[in-house]
């Protein structure tokens, strides 16, 4: 993973099915992978991380919903600290090319 990308995990608890579905789609569109219900993982740039925060503001109700973004190192730790996952569940980042 290059210096421009960070490995992150996004976890959320969203009451409304419609808002939860929209957030799920938005996180997939950013390039994150769902690894559990309401948990996403992947590599993002600083701009993509800001886009996630904007989606939280746009979609979530601060009185009812919760979400967090944390830096992680699951590729390195998955074999030691995870149950039910393999290294294949956390593949290396692929290059991003400008067309």
Task: Locate predicted features.
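Basic nucleic-acid-binding interfaces
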Residues: 2-9, 15-99
